[in-house]
Design a protein with these regions (language model features):
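Domain-exit/linker segments immediately C-terminal to small folded modules
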Residues: 172-175
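Generic hydrophobic alpha-helical scaffold/packing signal
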Residues: 18, 37, 137-140, 160, ...
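Short beta-strand-alpha-helix junction that forms the catalytic/metal-binding core
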Residues: 134, 146-169
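Polyanionic (Asp/Glu-rich) segments that form extended negatively charged tracts
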Residues: 1-22
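Intrinsically disordered, low-complexity N-proximal targeting/linker segments that flank membranes
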Residues: 45-136, 144
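Short secondary-structure subsegments characteristic of cysteine-rich extracellular domains
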Residues: 31-44
Length: 175
């Protein structure tokens, strides 16, 4: 349920999933779903493909082969960089950062609702590639955080997904 490719942490992440669906013609079942989700989050939150992507893809194809057999892969060599909630608070939001993109995938997976209408937010690839996208908005206004001496105004956890219409017509008009 990640509706747009612009928020995928790495394009290379598609390769293992394409491999899976090439060999398994039907939808994943049971533990395969759980193992594919685990693979996605481990690869996404570990900066997995930030260097030596080809060798890591070869390792990950072996993991996918295990998942095809409904076996859980070993991830001893994959370090997930999330030790505490403070790690998220300390991370500055950037659309080029794979870690931020992973969190955006988590937000998009939850099918965000419009603050005003409660309708589904339409996410658009063309806008999600840039940090000043109409779909991104600071949850707590930067001026409010500065005025109250509250930490990192550009924190990843201070970003919300909003409809382009709400951001353009309502929020910006009041800023």
């Amino acid at each position: 349920r990640i509706p747009v490719s612009a928020i995928l942490p790495y394009d290379a992440l598609l390769v293992p999933f394409i491999y899976f669906f090439y060999y398994q013609k039907e939808n994943p079942k049971g533990t395969q779903i759980k193992y594919l989700e685990e693979f996605f989050w481990r690869a996404s939150l570990s900066f997995r493909y930030s260097s030596a992507a080809e060798s890591k893809l070869a390792q990950d194809i072996k993991r996918i082969e295990k998942i095809l057999n409904s076996e859980r892969p070993n991830y001893d060599d994959v370090k997930v960089y999330l030790n505490s909630p403070q790690d998220l608070i300390d991370t500055n939001f950037s659309t080029g950062n794979s870690y931020c993109k992973a969190v955006l995938c988590l937000l998009a997976y939850q099918e965000p609702k419009d603050f005003q209408t409660n309708g589904k937010i339409i996410l658009d690839n063309s806008w999600l590639k840039v940090a000043n996208s109409r779909n991104y908005h600071h949850f707590f206004p930067k001026a409010y955080l500065r005025k109250n001496n509250i930490g990192n105004e550009h924190s990843l956890v201070n970003i919300s997904l909003v409809s382009a219409d709400l951001n353009k017509r309502k929020i910006r008009a009041q800023a």
